[in-house]
A protein has these predicted regions:
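Thiamine diphosphate
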Residues: 6-10, 19-47, 52, 67, ...
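Short, glycine-rich nucleotide/cofactor-binding loops
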Residues: 1-4
């Protein structure tokens, strides 16, 4: 089901699935920006509304192999309701030697670095490219975005500055949840959250939409460098 159409089933997600404790698996297509599909088809709200319903597990694959493995896990391993969200379009090239091993998150780069990017889904590839142009930074790739693994939060809590990037609305989404979990850890790290603010996304190419909201590689590199040059 397209992310935008799943919005119409919000009542069923709560009353007919979660409250009944049913085993339901949703493949949420067109999650994130959908480019020329149109303003009403942008899949930017599913992370927020799925975040609000008890009992759901949500995955966000970047690659086809992850999607297949997550679907298998949803069918045969995970209890309860599961959603697997993925974007319109093809897959980026996986990092050399990368294999998904059913872990809820994965760190790429030096985990002892002083800064980190946190992201999921399609934007992982963008963030991975961005750190190639930055120093002293690593990426936390969230494979499961609900519930967020406590170990992922603990890894981020050790750094001095954290940037969370997501192709979804800011309000009620994964980034806000991650920030709340960081606060519970008592971290002193600076936290920056880049996502879609309180607005609708106009029809345009996916690349244009990513640039507009600062979610392309050049914008990420620029934002991190700017924060480095202007410490709080």
């Amino acid at each position: 089901v397209y992310s935008t159409f799943l919005q119409r089933a919000y009542d069923q997600l709560i009353h007919d699935v979660s409250m009944q404790g049913l085993k339901v698996i949703l493949a949420v297509d067109r999650a994130g920006f959908v480019g020329e599909d149109g303003e009403s088809h942008q899949g930017i709200f599913d992370t927020s509304y799925l975040n609000s319903v008890p009992g759901w597990t949500v995955y966000a694959p970047t690659y086809y192999a992850e999607l297949c493995s997550m679907l298998y896990q949803a069918i045969y391993v995970d209890p309860g309701a599961v959603a697997i969200r993925y974007p319109r379009g093809g897959e980026p090239t996986p990092p050399e030697g990368y294999q998904y091993e059913k872990e809820p998150f994965r760190i790429f780069g030096d985990p002892g670095a002083k800064r980190c990017l946190v992201t999921y889904g399609r934007l992982f590839d963008t963030c991975l490219q961005a750190i190639g142009e930055l120093d002293d930074i690593f990426v936390i790739k969230l494979n499961r975005i609900r519930p967020i693994a406590p170990e992922a939060v603990a890894a981020a809590a050790k750094v001095q500055a954290i940037w969370f990037y997501e192709e979804a609305t800011v309000s009620g989404g994964v980034g806000q949840t991650f920030a709340a979990l960081l606060e519970e850890k008592g971290t002193s790290a600076r936290f920056f959250h880049k996502a879609v603010p309180d607005t609708f996304v106009k029809q345009a190419s996916v690349d244009s939409q990513l640039r507009k909201f600062g979610l392309d590689k050049a914008s990420i590199v620029s934002e991190v460098n700017h924060a480095e040059e202007n410490p709080a």
